[in-house]
Amino acid sequence: MRHCIIFIVCISIVEIRTVHIEFIKEIVVIFRIVDHFSPFMLPCLLSHCKDGDTIIFVCQSVMKVRNISLWNKLVLVRHCVLLCAFLLSFFNVLHSIISICRIF
């Protein structure tokens, strides 16, 4: 079964605002993976998040994607930006590993 990936940027925990795509590259990326997302999980997820966190929801059906987008609180980002975010996260992790290796 194909999975739909939704990329969500939390600017404020109180009110999730939409973000212009060009701002995403400046956000420190923190990924939290949810296999089976339902709208009831959002308050629980937000209680563990900080302002500026990045969440990726992996949904099993397009219908769930449509249900989430109806809230008008979440921003859906194109796959190319999602790829850039993954690469940014990868290089940040790689840089951290190299920095730790230099210490030892």
From Swiss-Prot:
Is Magnesium a UniProt keyword of this protein? Answer: no
Annotated GO biological process: protein targeting to vacuole
Knockout-associated phenotype: Causes a vacuolar protein sorting defect.
Its transmembrane ranges are 4-24, 80-100
State the compartments where it is located.
Membrane
* UniProt topology in membrane: Multi-pass membrane protein
Q: Which UniProt keywords apply?
A: Membrane, Transmembrane, Transmembrane helix
Per the record, GO CC terms?
A: membrane
Give additional notes from the record: Partially overlaps SFH1. Disruption phenotypes caused by deletion of this gene may also be a result of a defect in its overlapping gene.
Q: What is this protein called?
A: Putative uncharacterized protein VPS65
